[in-house]
Structure formats: structure tokens, C-alpha cells
């Protein structure tokens, strides 16, 4: 192999990407997107060039809707919306669509605060009405989720908001809180970083939303799944493009949708179906997370501070007991093809995001590296 061939091979090498988002995509999906880049299914056009109202893209959109509904077993009385703006925008869009549902004069919502993203959600919601913090684990540095029995929920709240997987601190609800439809409450959840990693109990949730760039596809697409009877309560000042009822009535084409992001998300949905569906991925995700947490817990060199009852399967933060070795850890990991392991700046340490598309081999490679780094650092 000559130098040019080696350079070409190196440029084509794939690393194990542990980024929290935008994040790893299935190799099969990337290969299919590459094959169809110049001409989607013989159309002579890239998906990026298509009119969103042309029959080619309409078929892509319809298939994506159908596959997502099938994968999550979304009931018929829920609407699936493809939007833009990410979960950050939904922090405003949710209260603009729901907070006046029970009272036009005194809009109110309950928020459960379990990490950085739910902090941001409640801060934004305060612009549109009263926010009651029903529970918070901030005093415990977000190392656990408050017990549901201690939540102080309001009788007059239009909805209860949760972030069911906190990407930064690494906590995840392992069970659906029993506060939803059976109790007459509307529960809204930000599921950005673990959507499609486990089945959904629709008795527990009225609205799910999330950015696609963590566990579905590229940045640019936001997914909202909302019970149909909740559409139509938007604030008069809610932008039309973010009014869920208008978006639903226009088939998520009130404005030009993020066409290529929807196309790639659709490829991911089909990939998940080939893997055996969400249930099969959940089993795989449990194995991956257990492997990494078990190694960390058995080590005297690394630690994870999250209570075992609510550790995230998707985002695993960990710390070196000797933080002076952090930069060496990251540099040596990168040399081994293990990238994007630096923890969020607000937390520090390391973080391995092991979403659906991260293969078991990637977690095995990370554990092997961590074991060797610990050995040589001793």
C-alpha cells in the first residue's frame, strides 16, 4: 500500500463517536444516504433539491410518519408533528400551546427539575405564566430524581413538565411516573436524548417532544407527539409556524420542513425496524449501559455520582479520581479512535453517550481503553 492509499484509508476510517449530540448515526444509514445523494431512487434529484410539496418528498414524509407511529405504537388519538427549532424552542412552544388550557387569566404549569435541561425549560416557561416547581433535586446536585410521592403537584396546572433523560448530568426516569391520564393530568416530557431507546407508556404522557440530533438523525428536525384534544389552546401571540393545531392541519408543512433531516430520520426509523424495533434496542441498550457502569463501579480509578436507581442508559458521565490526568485520558482515547468523551463544561469530567447507533463493540473498546489507562496510570 503506497502513501496515497494509506492516507485515503485513514481518511475513511470511522471512529467511535461518543458525542452527546449531534451524535453517531448507524453506518448503514450513512451509506444509504451516500448512495442516494445524487439521485434518490432514480429521481435524478438529491432529497436536498426536492420540492417539499413534490410527490417524491411527500412519499418520504408519509413513510417517516408511518414508521415512527409504528415504532412507538403511537395511538390514533395522538398527532405526530415534524417541526424545527429544537427542544430549546419547545421550551417556549409548549407553554405557548398549553399553558392557557385551563385558564386564560391565570395560566399555570408544574415543572419537575432534575437537571440542566429542565432548569432551562422552567425558566423559559415563566415568561408565559406561573410556574410551580413541583419537585427539584438541585440541592442534591441532580444526582437522583425526587421520589414521585414527594412531588407537590398543583390542582390548577395546565400540565406537568418533565425531562425524562437529562443528557448533561446523566439521570433518566426508569419508570413512567404514575401521575398521568389516570389522575386527570396532562404530562409533557422532553425526550430528546432517549426517544426510541425504550417503549413509551402512552397512559403516562400527553405530549412528547425532542430534538432529533441525539438519538434519531441530524440536527434540524424537532418531533412533537401530542394528544389531539390538546391542540387548539395556543396563545394568540404564538407564532403560526409553532401553533401545533395549524402545523397538524397542514401536515407539518405549514412552512418548508427540514427535508433532508426528515429523510435521514426516516432511514433511521427503517434501520430500527430492521434491528427488531424499539424493544430489541432497549435490550441492547441495557447491556451496553450495564457493561460501562459495572466497570466504573468496580474501579477505584473512575466514579459515577448518579444514584443507581436513575442512571441514564444513554448518557454516562464519569470522573477520574485524579483529574490532573483528564487531558491525557482524552488525548490517548482519541488516538485509539474514541472521540467526544469530554464532559459538559458545567459538570466536567467525562461523558460517554451511547445512543441506539453506538454498537456494543464501541462500548467494549471504551471499557478496554479505560482499563488499560488505569493500569498504566497506576
From Swiss-Prot:
The modification N6-(pyridoxal phosphate)lysine is found at residue 214. Pathway: Amino-acid biosynthesis; L-serine biosynthesis; L-serine from 3-phospho-D-glycerate: step 2/3; Cofactor biosynthesis; pyridoxine 5'-phosphate biosynthesis; pyridoxine 5'-phosphate from D-erythrose 4-phosphate: step 3/5. Its EC number is 2.6.1.52. GO terms for molecular function: O-phospho-L-serine:2-oxoglutarate aminotransferase activity; pyridoxal phosphate binding. GO terms for cellular component: cytoplasm. Binds 1 pyridoxal phosphate per subunit. GO terms for biological process: L-serine biosynthetic process; pyridoxine biosynthetic process. It comes from the Bacteria. InterPro entries: Aminotrans_V_dom (IPR000192), Pser_aminoTfrase (IPR022278), PyrdxlP-dep_Trfase (IPR015424), PyrdxlP-dep_Trfase_major (IPR015421), PyrdxlP-dep_Trfase_small (IPR015422). Keywords: Amino-acid biosynthesis, Aminotransferase, Cytoplasm, Pyridoxal phosphate, Pyridoxine biosynthesis, Serine biosynthesis, Transferase. Its main location: cytoplasm. Signal peptide: none annotated. HAMAP family: SerC_aminotrans_5. Homodimer. This is Phosphoserine aminotransferase. It comes from Ralstonia nicotianae (strain ATCC BAA-1114 / GMI1000) (Ralstonia solanacearum). The lineage of its organism: Bacteria, Pseudomonadati, Pseudomonadota, Betaproteobacteria, Burkholderiales.
